[in-house]
Amino acid sequence: MMGRFHRHDDGTVHTHEHDHHPHDHDHGDHSGYETETQRIDVLEEIFAENDVRANFNRAAFESNGIRALNLMSSPGSGKTTVLQATLDELAGEFAIGVIEGDIATDLDAAKLSGRGAQVSLLNTSNGFGGECHLDAPMVNRALPGLDLPALDLVIIENVGNLVCPAEFDVGEHAKAMVYSVTEGEDKPLKYPVMFRSVDVVLLNKIDLVPHLDADVDTYIAHVREVNATATILPVSARTGAGMAAWFGWLRRFAGDPED
């Protein structure tokens, strides 16, 4: 069985492992089967095509004076709750568009409606790898659902998954992730791909720390082991604790000269 394919920062793709199965037949040519090299070539082509479309998306944003943020997390981290609070705070200051990615349903999109932002829903169940991430062609298909010339900021809420979304450029200018204390302090060490890729980490649900065997400093230290430069913001989207720092980061990112 082939191992999982992974893309490095330089664009190269490789498998992590090859699972050997017990048998005594010859490992010669298996007619009709792709070799590992052939499969890697196909994946590199997919990534290359994705990067072309990502650059197209980024150019579309920039031609309209838009800053785009890719917001990622594992399922249940509180990403949508963070986004709700963000719209409530900033929609009066910036014209915000949201591309809401989910495998199915419009539940999260419905939570964001009526908060002063344009929302374009993107269900991913039919796309390549769509069960676990957004890619640039998917985001491109969502753009007609937004009035780009009217916007200042687009937030792309990616599918809840701790690995795959970080490997696909969707045309953003920065990546952010929501990481909740309920996920455990070891996640940056066990699943470093996303943590390495982001510009800002929101350590969410800190209001639950008194009820957990958890130490915020340990969470932060583990993030620092894999990403020495990311901004780390302990927050509670539910209570509002620490969220002012996140709003300030977004204001600077979106180009507000007053912040």
Question: Which role fits each region the language model picked out?
Answer:
Residues 208-259:
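Canonical P-loop GTPase G-domain recognition
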Residues 97, 200, 231-233:
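A structural signal for isolated positions on well-ordered beta-strands in alpha/beta enzyme cores
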Residues 82:
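Hydrophobic positions on the alpha1 helix immediately C-terminal to the Walker A/P-loop
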Residues 164-173, 178-229:
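Conserved C-terminal guanine-recognition region of P-loop GTPase G domains, centered on the G4
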Residues 33-72, 77, 86-173, 184-186, ...:
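Nucleotide-state-sensitive switch-loop elements of NTP-binding domains
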Residues 1-38:
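Histidine-centered metal-binding segments
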